[in-house]
């Protein structure tokens, strides 16, 4: 790896994403963010020799050599523009909760200030014959959140629906060719913010950002304001 962030990889982290941004608010409940960010996975393998060495190390330990893929380095710098708006409760009379829309554009840079040249898919990884730049799979994002009112609570507020969020992502090169959809439902059960989610598409992991997968899960969502 040959950049400032690559030399000091984050410990026990698979997605490192610092961003500097300027936020401009207005009186209509919306804001704009203009940012410069860096995203990486904190790994070090960036050539076939290092990959083969790691591969053989796993084999020598009687583990699958393919585990070496987890050490492949990924990193990008990008510029971004975000717009978010919280709509008045009475925008849709049939819904008495709060609706929030968010749009984001990230342009991944060919030579960033922090990363330098991007570290993305290498053809030596699987003998491929074509590039798979990140902008084919990511860069345009839209999310729609609905924050439920307290009317959606039962058993004396021991169970409440908190938030429903739909997220759609695609690349800005060949738009809508590679799409990712995520649906999340957050509830509050006895004070615990339990989240159910399902995802279909790309970017489930920075190493394999170009692989199409379907996944779902259950977790806890803690948000600090």
Give, region by region, the residue ranges found by the protein language model:
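Outer-membrane pore/translocation modules
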Residues: 1-176, 197-200, 211-212
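Surface-exposed substrate-engagement region within the catalytic domains
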Residues: 152, 172-175, 180-187, 191-193
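Outer-membrane beta-barrel "beta-signal"
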Residues: 196, 213-225
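Histidine-bearing beta->alpha loop at or near hydrolase active sites
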Residues: 203
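Short proline/glycine-enriched turn/loop segments at secondary-structure junctions
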Residues: 206-210
